[in-house]
Amino acid sequence: MQREFVSGAGLGLRRALLEPFGAGDEVRVDFLEVAPENWSGSGGRRGRQFRELTERLPFLCHGLSLNLGGYAPLDMSLLRAIKGFIEQHDIRAYSEHLSACADDGQLYDLMPLPFSDESVRRVAERVRVVQDVLERPLIVENVSAYARLPGELEEVDFVRAVLEEADCQLLLDVNNVYVNACNFGFDAHAYIAAMPSRRIAYLHMAGHDEQGASLKIDTHGAPVCDPVWELLAHAYACHGERPTLLERDFNLPPLSELYAETDRIRELQRRSGEAQLRSLGYGT
């Protein structure tokens, strides 16, 4: 039976965090997220530490290799392995990127998709297959990009169309919206407002790298910048408070600095909840 979904502020689990999280101290986040490809089959001490954490805290999975946007057949052995991992560790939900990552071999990167009606139909069909195999809803994530492929749709319309055609949920990556808005010149606030609230399962926050004035790279290697924090508040204002996770893959700072960012997420969630109550006539 599928468990209750997560709430509050979460953090992406990286190997360097296993030791501090396993030291017996309280883990000051509400949930954790992992890429199943990086943890499936872990044995020995690392496997035991990971199992202890999955027994203590709610977990989400965020996949890297499913190739939702590709033309090659879906990797059914990978899907079955992911399903087993989800069941073994009582994972609350599974998400994947709206991207391609394989074509007669693994590309080891998340490649952009053409924003076309044909692409919508193909991706939606693959999402439906994944949902049937996993026997649970799939959550898809908007991705960062640095080049556009030919297509008749805008990114925002493509994402909305996939959600409706596939009847799936959205992981709204706020930093990716900001990065793409800067790189391609669209309105990040309008993009976020246009997403269907009922489809949004949770949100991602991260930092990025600036390559000059006109190019931003989604690295997950820096603190979240002020414009992205402002966009998170905007997302809550548009869609209500949602579970929100901080990603940090590189240049890991002391845990206290990561907690400062997850605490900031909680504060924005608290303010959003208070604003919602005021709009309903409660409080002053």
Regions found by a protein language model. Give the residues of each.
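Boundary/entry segment of secreted carbohydrate-active catalytic domains
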Residues: 1-21
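Hydrophobic faces of well-ordered beta-strands that scaffold small-molecule active sites
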Residues: 7-13, 30-34, 59-62, 94-96, ...
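Acidic-and-aromatic substrate-binding clefts and catalytic sites of carbohydrate-active enzymes
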Residues: 18-19, 36-48, 67-77, 147-152, ...
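Acidic (Asp/Glu)-rich catalytic clusters
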Residues: 22-27, 44-61, 77-92, 128-133, ...
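Gly/Pro-rich active-site loop or hairpin
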Residues: 43, 73, 110-120, 181-239
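Active-site acidic/histidine proton-transfer and metal-coordination neighborhood
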Residues: 75-170
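Acidic/histidine-rich catalytic cores of soluble enzymes
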Residues: 131-215
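C-terminal helical cap(s) of enzyme catalytic domains, especially alpha/beta-barrels
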Residues: 255-276
